[in-house]
Regions:
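Generic structural detector for well-ordered beta-strands
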Residues: 34-38, 65, 77, 88, ...
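Beta-strand/loop substructures that line and gate deep hydrophobic ligand-binding cavities in soluble
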Residues: 102-156, 161-163
Length: 166
């Protein structure tokens, strides 16, 4: 019984520390990453804007639902094993830039993703992704900072693009 109390106390202490650290972390963060691919800006832009095809190349995305547009802006919902997230396309500059925003106020996080494409010559393109994120829940702030890493999803996305375009 004594070990049960010690184990339970240790769990409570770890959770309390995670909450305290989470409260100390800022709500907003910025993370970015980039990779260069053997593909033209046009082919990369087509890949990242054809959201209906995400389940065929993005790891973790099981389905994409196209939703009614808001103020003429495309909206879609990504479905994964962890749930779903609704996005809205804030702006596009064909073959140069895409900006999406999480469009779901019920989530404990939000923010925008900016995809910048730069031709680097010889049919190669650098894709830079910048996340301007917000994590409202202190426990999620702790997890996103110390467990997943702010750039974890960006790294996965870039790796998925690389697998798709070669």
């Amino acid at each position: 019984m004594r070990y049960l109390w010690i184990g339970g106390g240790a769990i409570v202490l770890v959770v309390a520390i995670a909450v305290a650290v989470g409260y100390a972390l800022p709500v907003k963060h910025r993370a970015s990453g980039e990779s260069t691919f053997k593909a033209t800006p046009d082919s990369i832009f087509t890949l990242i804007t054809t959201v209906e095809a995400f389940p065929t190349w993005r790891s973790g995305v099981k389905a994409v639902e196209i939703l009614p547009a808001t103020d003429g802006r495309k909206r879609f919902r990504e479905v994964s094993g962890h749930g779903s997230i609704t996005f809205v396309v804030e702006s596009t500059e064909p073959n140069k830039r895409l900006v999406t925003r999480i469009d779901d106020k019920s989530l404990p996080f939000g923010g925008t993703w900016t995809y910048d494409l730069s031709p680097t010559g010889a049919g190669r393109t650098t894709l830079r992704i910048t996340e301007d994120g917000e994590v409202y829940n202190p426990i999620f702030r702790f997890v996103s900072r110390f467990v997943m890493g702010y750039d974890g999803t960006i790294k996965t996305y870039l790796a998925d693009v690389g697998k798709r375009v070669g």
